[in-house]
Amino acid sequence: MPATFGIVDLFSGPGGLGEGFASLDLSGHAPFKIGISVEKEASAHRTLTLRAFLRAHQARHGTLPQAFIDFHAGLIPEPGWSEVDAAAWRHATAEAQCLELGTEPAAAAIDHAIGALRRDFDDTILIGGPPCQAYSLVGRARAKGKVGYVPEEDERHYLFRDYIRVLDRLRPAAFVMENVKGMLSSTVESRLVFEMLMEDLASLGTGQGHHYEMRAIRVADSRASLQEAAQPSDFIVRAEEFGVPQRRHRVIIVGIRSDLADRATGTSIPVSGVARAVDDAIGTMPDENGGGKFVHGSGGLVLLRAA
């Protein structure tokens, strides 16, 4: 039977990275299940919880709840989701935690989740990316304009260590860490933050078992694969190389536990590689002010326009 991996998602935001993992379907098998996601910002956490609810409902019933479709079509006000599907809502509120990493409540919740993940899944994966404001070029420019700002006193520079503490506790099969490109040039204590991060990652497993081998996602000949990085910039992933109509560049580090690293060697997946314009992706979406409503059709949701 194919392996199933339990996911720990840190600094989750509204859950985009976790949604990508959870949505993967391999011939009817979903290899990734989110065990816990952690986000401290309230509005992002609301979206995170709703997405967890929708996944749980769809797993139980095979479709999205009609109330969700009607709500987004403007036909009804937002319902109480616990009344729509109480079991799915309980699952969602247990999965999506509104907590701040580095605090005792967060540590207790993550430790509890780790125990369940080890019991219920073949192995685990850690995903997430520390908040980027301290590393982004815009964030750094704003910080310079603040009177009395001292980078060494900005805790956001060191949030990656909360990620590493969980990584050390979980010891997953693999991890994925994402951040803005500015992380490569951001400095604190007269050192590059990226250099500090890589040193901390490399120290895991020293003298106590398996370490992690860091890999970069590289695209060549319309195929993506995990490769050793010769330089920090190799970790930059360019969205347009994957057919995304956006020039969004992000640093993504993939770490593979050393006892599994050989399995990733020589493996690749096809990618689009075709440049797409925004109109290619959303040109068929309905006009926001065009009226009409959504109904179920043979190919999914269909917009019925008013005459």
Predicted features along the sequence, with ranges:
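Class I S-adenosyl-L-methionine
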Residues: A116-D120, Q133, L137-A307
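Core alpha/beta nucleotide-donor-binding catalytic domains of modification enzymes
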Residues: P2-S12, G16-R171, K181-E195
